[in-house]
Amino acid sequence: MAHSVKIYDTCIGCTQCVRACPTDVLEMVPWDGCRANQIASAPRTEDCVGCKRCESACPTDFLSVRVYLGAETTRSMGLAY
């Protein structure tokens, strides 16, 4: 089951999340909305393994990239509420 990867407009274009992703889910794309003129994009969410390394690597106070685990993965990890 694929996970949902969301990129928020608080992204500063630092590339930390892209470099941290072991499955190359993320890439940088041109965007005029930040100083770096690029923003992270998640075109291959079907390859996301849910490790959340991208979240850990994000230096912004409000995480600019978030991984939302699929329900099946959440249950198997014992995280369901």
Curated annotation (Swiss-Prot):
Keywords: 4Fe-4S, Chloroplast, Electron transport, Iron, Iron-sulfur, Membrane, Metal-binding, Oxidoreductase, Photosynthesis, Photosystem I, Plastid, Repeat, Thylakoid, Transport. Residues 2-31, 39-68 form the 4Fe-4S ferredoxin-type domain. Its EC number is 1.97.1.12. GO terms for molecular function: 4 iron, 4 sulfur cluster binding; electron transfer activity; metal ion binding; oxidoreductase activity. Disulfide bonds: none annotated. The keyword Chloroplast applies. Its main location: plastid. Pfam families: Fer4_7. GO terms for cellular component: chloroplast thylakoid membrane; photosystem I. Signal peptide: none annotated. It is found in: Plastid, Chloroplast thylakoid membrane. One of its GO terms (biological process) is photosynthetic electron transport in photosystem I. It is a peripheral membrane protein. Binds 2 [4Fe-4S] clusters. Cluster 2 is most probably the spectroscopically characterized electron acceptor FA and cluster 1 is most probably FB. The eukaryotic PSI reaction center is composed of at least 11 subunits. This is Photosystem I iron-sulfur center. The gene is psaC.
